[in-house]
């Protein structure tokens, strides 16, 4: 059922923008309101602004204004950086992985979440990266105790939306290495980036 829903572009765009809306909520501290209200306000603002930003990238891709090799290199770098950051349990991992999730659906990939062998890998990597993110003990020392409920709400929302772009990033990672074109690279045959017609 989840694979069926992910086959629709609108559903993928919605997940990407929702995850990216939670990415920078800690950097906004100028609002004179509760943490929960501030987080919801930032989510709405990021959702609207990044929706227009993503459509601009989609417009450039359809008009062939950007070379496919540029998107290929960008996508590879984002996969590597987000995977390492999440696996190491970094505190800012939700920022990078959310950017990855918002970028991938608009880079023209025709094979998105279609690898059958990727789901066991998702479960293993998600379980290994969940412990350092969910068991952080420094959150209660940073914030005042009067807003403990709001703080817990924000921490849980950040960690929850960390795993959504992480799954998307690992899906693209597995999909890339399972593609037949990658077998030619392993056999030391030269391949030009323009041959990656599947981008």
Swiss-Prot record:
> Which UniProt keywords are listed?
Membrane, Transmembrane, Transmembrane helix
**Topology with regard to the membrane?**
Multi-pass membrane protein
Give the superkingdom in one word. Eukaryota
According to the record, the segments passing through the membrane are: 40-60, 86-106, 117-137, 166-186
Q: Where in the cell is it found?
A: Membrane
Q: List the disulfide bonds.
A: none
Instruction: Print the miscellaneous field.
Output: Completely overlaps MET28.
Protein name in UniProt:
Putative uncharacterized protein YIR017W-A
Q: Which organism is it from?
A: Saccharomyces cerevisiae (strain ATCC 204508 / S288c)
Traced from the root, the source organism's taxonomic lineage reads: Eukaryota, Fungi, Dikarya, Ascomycota, Saccharomycotina
């Amino acid at each position: 059922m989840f694979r069926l829903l992910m086959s629709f572009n609108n559903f993928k765009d919605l997940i990407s923008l929702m995850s990216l809306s939670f990415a920078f909520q800690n950097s906004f501290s100028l609002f004179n309101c509760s943490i929960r209200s501030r987080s919801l306000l930032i989510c709405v603002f990021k959702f609207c602004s990044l929706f227009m930003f993503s459509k601009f990238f989609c417009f450039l891709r359809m008009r062939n204004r950007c070379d496919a090799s540029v998107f290929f290199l960008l996508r590879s770098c984002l996969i590597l950086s987000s995977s390492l950051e999440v696996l190491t349990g970094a505190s800012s991992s939700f920022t990078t992985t959310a950017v990855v999730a918002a970028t991938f659906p608009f880079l023209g990939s025709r094979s998105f979440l279609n690898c059958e062998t990727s789901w066991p890998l998702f479960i293993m990597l998600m379980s290994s990266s969940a412990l350092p993110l969910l068991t952080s003990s420094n959150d209660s020392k940073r914030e005042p105790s009067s807003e403990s409920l709001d703080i817990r709400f924000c921490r849980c929302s950040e960690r929850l939306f960390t795993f959504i772009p992480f799954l998307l990033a690992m899906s693209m990672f597995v999909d890339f290495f399972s593609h037949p074109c990658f077998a030619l690279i392993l056999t030391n045959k030269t391949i030009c980036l323009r041959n990656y017609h599947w981008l």
